[in-house]
Amino acid sequence: MKKASIVLLFWLLAGATPAIAAPVADWVQTDRVQFSGTDGFFRSQGVASDGQSLFFSWNLGLSRTEIDDTSVVLADNTTGAIPADLAESNHNHIGDIDYAWGWIYAPIEDGPEYAEPWVVIYDAETLQPTGQRYLLPASIQRDGVPWIAVDQARGVAYSMEWNDTGKLFVYNLSNFELLRTVTLSQPAPRIQGAKIYKGDLYASRDNGSEKSIVAINPETGTVTHLFDRNFGDDYEAEGIAFVRRSSGTMMVATGIREGAHGYTEMRIYRIGGDMTAPVLSRPRFGKAKVRRGTKAILLAGASEPVTATYRWARCIGPRSKPCLQIRNFGIPRRIEMSEGSNRVALPTGALRPGIWNLLLTPVDRADITGRSARLGLRVIRPRR
């Protein structure tokens, strides 16, 4: 299936545009990685992640590393990533990249003329060009294309100008035709990189000594200042990315400390600095047997506020081994649980008489997944 068809299919299956919650502001730095030698050059622009590895860009190339040990290089195209014909036409700068569907989306500029801003698609495994690329309108991307951000849920991609940043450009992800322009609530110049996280566009700015992180609502254009990093004037902020894993979401941001003792680095942030998984204590049903159509009362303690995903599964087997097989039923659903004791009434009208399992998995606001619990429940026939 061609890429454009895959993108269109995903967009149609995604359904309605996701609701946007208030952007997260309490990111706390929990780690820092400094790159030495040639790695400092090769990781000096953008960063992206598929949750399994990290992708880095610099002016002329791309590389892929392990997340937890960036010294382990998994793929290397650091010196010849720009297609030959573009390199011959003075395209000399890869900006902040993004990942989606097994591809890397790389913005490539031809400064200082900025006559042809391209988005070039690469295979994320090999970091080789796929042959698909899209020319953005130079009439609006007047000083190149510093970054590209892919919004899979909405089927679009975003970019902006670097200096005159009162507008957000929204491109059709299947062909990169301009769909619309969103006017920002306030200018946000010198954005070096941006990524979508839970519906908002989070951006890293190279603004003075502050080096701010801001969030942009891509539908309304509302700009929310999240926090300043205050790294000083001799620091150049670069790319930004989100690493989503069961151990929680990390926001990573790259930057360059200039001067005689300069270096390139990546700083790692977590929501509230949280690195501890949530725990459910004594999850159980109030009654082990309920009549179909009544409520099954779920009781559980929670170590912190969580969103718990639950799904029913029907037990199949003989009386001696009633759960010899387990067959999932319905779709996963979510319930909110507060810190401390919780009592949740779950409907059973769709459950046929028999033995059922409930798989309950807590996730906290830092996106850390706790240990799942499997609870048994017998459903009997309703009274006549």
Predicted features by range, described:
Residues E238-M275:
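Blade-level signature of beta-propeller repeat domains, shared across WD40, Kelch, NHL, RCC1
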Residues S320-L351:
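Glycine-centered tight-turn motifs at strand-turn-strand junctions
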Residues G51-Q52, W101-G102, A153-G155, K198-D200, ...:
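Short coil/turn segments that connect the beta-strands within blades of beta-propeller domains
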Residues S71-I108:
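Blade-loop segments of beta-propeller domains
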Residues G61-E66, E113-I121, T165-V170, S209-A215, ...:
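Structural motif
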Residues F41-A48, A87-D96, A138-V150, P187-I196, ...:
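Repeated scaffold domains used in trafficking and secretory/extracellular systems
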Residues V33-L60, H93:
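Beta-strand-rich domains and repeat architectures in extracellular enzymes and scaffolds
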